[in-house]
Each structure stands twice: as structure tokens, then as C-alpha cells.
């Protein structure tokens, strides 16, 4: 077996999660932002007028999977009924923020 100088490539993906249930007014955006930053993700989270929360995050598939698991639970006072995921094109964002 030859030893090449190939470096493993890190796959980056971007996903949108629409989070439904009692997810506004319970600290969901703040908790999501903290978790995303802990996972090294970039993107944003915001409340929607219809009561849902929208999350767009970019990073490794493993980190995105961890964020989705967090979104399915949310903070202690949240009652998540459903998370609807969809994959998006990568934008190359550098940070994670809370949008209004």
C-alpha cells in the first residue's frame, strides 16, 4: 500500500430547519445560536411570523446532525412538534447570528 500525500477533505453542507411547536418566547433562538457556535457552524436563526423558527446552518454533516437533534428538543420551555429539514446551496458564511 502506498502512502500518498492526500489530505482528507472536509465536507461542508448547508441545511434549513423549520422548527414547529411552542418555539417562540422560550429562548429557542439564543440556545440554538449557542449550540451552533459550540459545534463550529455558521448561519443564522430567526422567528417567523407564523410562530415557527427558521434555522439555516452550514458546516460538517456531523455538526449539522447534532444541531438538528438539539432543534428537535429545544430549550427546556420549548415544545417542539416537528422539524422540517431541507438542504441548501453553501454560502460560505463565517459566523452564526440571531436575526430578527
Swiss-Prot record:
The keyword tRNA processing does not apply. Residues 14-100 form the Acylphosphatase-like domain. InterPro entries: Acylphosphatase, Acylphosphatase-like_dom, Acylphosphatase-like_dom_sf, Acylphosphatase_CS. One of its GO terms (molecular function) is acylphosphatase activity. Keywords: Hydrolase. This is Acylphosphatase. Its EC number is 3.6.1.7. The active site is at 29, 47. It comes from the Bacteria. Belongs to the acylphosphatase family. Gene3D superfamilies: 3.30.70.100. It catalyses: an acyl phosphate + H2O = a carboxylate + phosphate + H(+).
Amino acid at each position: 500500500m502506498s502512502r500518498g500525500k492526500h489530505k482528507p477533505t472536509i465536507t461542508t453542507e448547508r441545511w434549513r430547519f423549520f422548527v414547529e411547536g411552542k418555539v417562540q418566547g422560550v429562548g429557542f433562538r439564543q440556545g440554538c445560536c449557542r449550540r451552533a457556535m459550540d459545534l463550529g457552524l455558521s448561519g443564522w436563526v430567526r422567528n417567523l411570523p407564523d410562530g415557527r423558527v427558521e434555522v439555516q446552518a452550514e458546516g460538517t454533516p456531523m455538526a449539522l446532525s447534532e444541531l438538528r437533534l438539539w432543534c428537535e428538543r429545544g430549550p427546556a420551555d420549548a415544545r417542539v412538534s416537528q422539524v422540517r429539514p431541507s438542504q441548501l446551496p453553501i454560502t460560505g458564511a463565517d459566523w452564526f447570528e440571531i436575526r430578527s
